[in-house]
Design a protein with these regions (language model features):
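Glycine-rich beta-strand-turn "strand-cap" elements at beta-sheet edges
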Residues: 1-2, 42-56, 78-117, 157-168, ...
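Short amphipathic alpha-helices in soluble, non-transmembrane regions
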Residues: 32, 72-80, 186-192
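A broad "ordered helical/assembly scaffold" signature
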Residues: 16, 60, 69, 81-82, ...
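Long, hydrophobic/aromatic-enriched structural stretches that serve as scaffold segments
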Residues: 32-65, 69-70
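Short S/T/G/P-rich N-terminal loop/turn motif that feeds into the first structured element of a domain
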Residues: 1-37, 67-69, 89-153, 165, ...
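Short, surface-exposed beta-edge/turn micro-motifs
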Residues: 4-6, 56-58, 119-121, 170-173
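A structural feature that tracks compact, well-ordered secondary-structure segments
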Residues: 11, 48-49, 59-65, 125, ...
Length: 222
């Protein structure tokens, strides 16, 4: 399997952008969209963040097999006119790896390569405690089996697990795709009572994102 790098770029929009003439904003948004679409070796999914998380206005969820190209294309976006009004507020990086705990993945797991995205994407950086890694493998597997069983009860919710060990501050980036946020919240509440929960060191900040076609997401910035 080719190495797949996954990057979540959260942008903060300079308020000065909204004071530009409407026609100029529309033109410059098109320039930015063309720069995204021109990076043909990278898959990009767009999410407008307006009103969803303070300090964030746009998420680009990107993945590709060449980290240098991910970096170069991000730089090209920053060089567009709109890009000069966008500061990176948060950035998370990792790899897709075969899970240690799941023998055979279902369509719920590792949905990163799907072309159709869910309406809602919920993302958070995640790190386990040191004590978790000092447990025996069988003990960890047992707790993960409980976690996985709960997840499979919510079959309409898809998960992407990105491994960040040694590449970023967190150990994982966890992303869920859902059509019903009430259902997703029920999943989270149920997972809170599993045994593995006590070995969570951190799982914030949490980002709730709304998927839109790229040009629609940019239009909401206008």
């Amino acid at each position: 399997m080719d190495t797949t790098f996954v990057q979540f770029l959260f942008y903060r929009l300079d308020p000065a952008w909204r004071r530009l003439p409407e026609e100029e904003r529309a033109c410059r948004s098109t320039e930015f969209a063309e720069a995204v679409e021109g990076a043909t070796e990278i898959t990009t999914h767009a999410y407008n963040m307006t009103g969803m998380k303070a300090g964030t206005d746009l998420l680009l969820w990107r993945h590709g097999t060449d980290l240098a190209e991910l970096q170069a294309s991000a730089s090209r976006l920053q060089q567009t006119t709109l890009g000069r009004y966008l500061d990176i507020a948060y950035s998370y990086l990792g790899l897709i790896r075969v899970s240690t705990y799941v023998r055979r993945q279902t369509p719920q797991e590792q949905a990163v390569l799907e072309t159709e995205r869910g309406t809602y994407l919920i993302i958070y950086p995640f790190t386990k405690t040191i004590d978790w890694y000092l447990l025996g493998k069988a003990t960890r597997q047992g707790m993960m089996n409980e976690h996985i069983k709960v997840g499979h009860e919510y079959e309409h919710i898809r998960q992407v697990l990105v491994h960040s060990f040694g590449l970023d501050d967190q150990e994982f980036v966890v992303a869920y795709e859902a059509e019903d946020l009430m259902e997703f919240q029920s999943l989270v509440m149920e997972l809170r009572s599993t045994d593995g929960r006590k070995y969570t060191l951190s799982d914030t900040p949490i980002f709730t994102c709304v998927h839109r076609p790229l040009r629609d997401a940019l239009e909401l910035l206008v």
